[in-house]
Amino acid sequence: MYQSPLIQDLHDRGLIAQITDAAALDKLLTEESVTLYCGFDPTADSLHLGHLVPVLILKRFQEAGHKPIALVGGATGMIGDPSFKATERKLNTPDVIASWVGKIRGQVEPFLKFDGANAAIMANNYDWFGGMNCLEFMRDIGKHFSVNAMIKKESVQQRLTREDQGISYTEFSYSLLQGYDFAELNKRYGCVLQIGGSDQWGNIVAGTDLTRRLHQKHVFGLTLPLITKADGTKFGKTESGAIWLDPKKTSPYAFYQFWLNTSDADVYKFMNFFTFLPVARIAEIEAADKASGTKPEAQRILAEEATRLVHGEVALMAARRITECLFSGQLADLTENDLEQLAQDGMPGVQLEKSNTGLIDALVASGLAKSKSEARTFIQSGSVAINGNKAEALDHAIGGDELLYGRFTILRRGKKNYGLISWQ
């Protein structure tokens, strides 16, 4: 049992992998408001689902009265963290990284409050590394790191023992940069806690050691467990790729559907990780689901809570509406924005010219039929619908009010096979 209700809650949720000095941190959190940080390197133009847990940890700490710092790695993003990566990262240009930094800041900011006694801070480590020269780095930072200790890190050893992949000095020096981030944030803002994924443990410990050496301060690290799925497949990925927090890369509808498809074996764990529902409430939901003997409610609750957190209430309502319309066949209730989400990533689709296209050709073009002969068979069997209305004429040409908002037509074969035509 922990004294700090926050640490106890994180423990109960299964969100703690390691803490550098658990007893001292637990005591400190019960005595005062602390400043903590988490770093986010711009490795793409959006954060993905794996970043959501640490973002929510910052939010949990702030709601408990502590002061969070979201550090965007404008400098470290130019290097690339080698931790447990099989190959060296591609180096992106400064202009690309600067663009990504701006986008990531915009994604993190809505989760935090930037006013009040424990107002959050957005920082960029390029602010202190950008003007530092090589001699300063080697003299003031490098002398505090033992190469012997660095080489022993598991993440480095994995690269050194691979015959086809070594590790460059650039990536090898990454932990020095991350370590100095902690020391600099301690000096500037009194930051005493760094959080990160379990793969960051070595870098975080390097930061606690460097801060002690440079500033004689006792600071802490807390790592979060690797998010795994019961079936062994990678979390946060679908057949079409990663689940992004940017709605332009993963629509709110696709985001919502991702959570709806969570397995029974994972759903309660993910409710603890990705929602602010009390642990006791999640246990009640699990007990009710198991007692009911029917379809669990947990997936719907998780999908609603997570979508609301990331995309807001309006986007959640749209995701629910799209889901219900496709289930009921009442496609007339879909808005133009709903159809744009489906065209983005919610449904297999095809772009066609507005030219009196026949239904048979449309079925083939959309992938709902392998050939014109098969398309005719589907139509004759009564299994084809246009915007939810059964289509029976073999010579039917799609047009008029079948072009929803003048832009879209939804074809259905059977009960579950959809194709969305975007008319050009």
From Swiss-Prot:
<feature type="domain" description="S4 RNA-binding">
    <location>
        <begin position="357"/>
        <end position="414"/>
    </location>
</feature>
<feature type="binding site">
    <location>
        <position position="174"/>
    </location>
    <ligand>
        <name>L-tyrosine</name>
    </ligand>
</feature>
<comment type="subunit">
    <text>Homodimer.</text>
</comment>
<dbReference type="GO" id="GO:0004831">
    <property type="term" value="F:tyrosine-tRNA ligase activity"/>
</dbReference>
<dbReference type="Pfam" id="PF22421">
    <property type="entry name" value="SYY_C-terminal"/>
</dbReference>
<dbReference type="InterPro" id="IPR002307">
    <property type="entry name" value="Tyr-tRNA-ligase"/>
</dbReference>
<dbReference type="InterPro" id="IPR002305">
    <property type="entry name" value="aa-tRNA-synth_Ic"/>
</dbReference>
<dbReference type="InterPro" id="IPR002942">
    <property type="entry name" value="S4_RNA-bd"/>
</dbReference>
<comment type="similarity">
    <text>Belongs to the class-I aminoacyl-tRNA synthetase family. TyrS type 1 subfamily.</text>
</comment>
<dbReference type="InterPro" id="IPR024088">
    <property type="entry name" value="Tyr-tRNA-ligase_bac-type"/>
</dbReference>
<keyword id="KW-0648">Protein biosynthesis</keyword>
<feature type="binding site">
    <location>
        <position position="237"/>
    </location>
    <ligand>
        <name>ATP</name>
    </ligand>
</feature>
<feature type="binding site">
    <location>
        <position position="37"/>
    </location>
    <ligand>
        <name>L-tyrosine</name>
    </ligand>
</feature>
<keyword id="KW-0694">RNA-binding</keyword>
<keyword id="KW-0067">ATP-binding</keyword>
<feature type="short sequence motif" description="'KMSKS' region">
    <location>
        <begin position="234"/>
        <end position="238"/>
    </location>
</feature>
<dbReference type="InterPro" id="IPR001412">
    <property type="entry name" value="aa-tRNA-synth_I_CS"/>
</dbReference>
<protein>
    <recommendedName>
        <fullName>Tyrosine--tRNA ligase</fullName>
        <ecNumber>6.1.1.1</ecNumber>
    </recommendedName>
</protein>
<dbReference type="InterPro" id="IPR036986">
    <property type="entry name" value="S4_RNA-bd_sf"/>
</dbReference>
<dbReference type="GO" id="GO:0003723">
    <property type="term" value="F:RNA binding"/>
</dbReference>
<keyword id="KW-0030">Aminoacyl-tRNA synthetase</keyword>
<dbReference type="GO" id="GO:0006437">
    <property type="term" value="P:tyrosyl-tRNA aminoacylation"/>
</dbReference>
<keyword id="KW-0963">Cytoplasm</keyword>
<dbReference type="GO" id="GO:0005524">
    <property type="term" value="F:ATP binding"/>
</dbReference>
<dbReference type="InterPro" id="IPR014729">
    <property type="entry name" value="Rossmann-like_a/b/a_fold"/>
</dbReference>
<keyword id="KW-0436">Ligase</keyword>
<comment type="function">
    <text>Catalyzes the attachment of tyrosine to tRNA(Tyr) in a two-step reaction: tyrosine is first activated by ATP to form Tyr-AMP and then transferred to the acceptor end of tRNA(Tyr).</text>
</comment>
<dbReference type="Pfam" id="PF00579">
    <property type="entry name" value="tRNA-synt_1b"/>
</dbReference>
<feature type="binding site">
    <location>
        <position position="178"/>
    </location>
    <ligand>
        <name>L-tyrosine</name>
    </ligand>
</feature>
<dbReference type="InterPro" id="IPR024107">
    <property type="entry name" value="Tyr-tRNA-ligase_bac_1"/>
</dbReference>
<dbReference type="GO" id="GO:0005829">
    <property type="term" value="C:cytosol"/>
</dbReference>
<dbReference type="InterPro" id="IPR054608">
    <property type="entry name" value="SYY-like_C"/>
</dbReference>
<keyword id="KW-0547">Nucleotide-binding</keyword>
<feature type="short sequence motif" description="'HIGH' region">
    <location>
        <begin position="42"/>
        <end position="51"/>
    </location>
</feature>
